Amino acid sequence: MASTFSFDIVSDFDRQELVNAVDQVIRDIKGRYDLKDTETTVELVEESINVSTDSEFTLDSVHTILREKAAKRNLSQKIFDFGKVESASGNRVRQEIKLKKGISQEIAKQISKLIRDEFKKVQASIQGDAVRVSAKSKDDLQVVMQRLKQEDYPVALQFTNYR
């Protein structure tokens, strides 16, 4: 049996669930009476979602639908970074919604500092865009997980590689 236990803190999302959510948004837009004739387009590219529509009101409706469908598929709302609304040709508006993935160095340092300050028997180390947390007791790791869930970070945190 291992003498130390560990887990990784990451910020990631299931790409296939996001694809499914965007497909549902597109189907909803085609089916909803108030959005049917707006020529709204929603496309998922590598690191963002591009939305183009007739008005800001319609854009807000698309945001609402996207948030609902993402929530139903267990995707955090924190993965969406709504960019500024740009006017496009012909009284249209467009917006790029960036997808957040990975933990920045600043947030990783905050997490590491919180763990060091509050939990003396637990070690945290920053490894790229993840934080590895290790301890001799699984119970200590579970307490750390509960404490981190109480914090409100600007990214969605997941706990992986629990060993």
Curated annotation (Swiss-Prot):
Entries under SUPFAM superfamilies matching the protein: YajQ-like
Q: Report the transmembrane regions from the record.
A: none
Q: Which UniProt keywords apply?
A: Nucleotide-binding
Please indicate which superkingdom the organism of origin belongs to. Bacteria
- UniProt keyword GTP-binding, yes or no: no
Task: Enumerate the Pfam families for this protein.
Answer: DUF520
Single GO cellular component annotation?
cytosol
Q: Which GO terms describe its molecular function?
A: nucleotide binding
Question: Which Gene3D superfamilies does this chain map to?
Answer: 3.30.70.860, YajQ-like, domain 2
Q: Does the keyword Transcription apply?
A: no
Q: State the family named in the UniProt similarity comment for this chain.
A: Belongs to the YajQ family.
Q: What does this protein do?
A: Nucleotide-binding protein.
Protein name, per record: Nucleotide-binding protein Npun_R4736
Q: Which organism is it from?
A: Nostoc punctiforme (strain ATCC 29133 / PCC 73102)
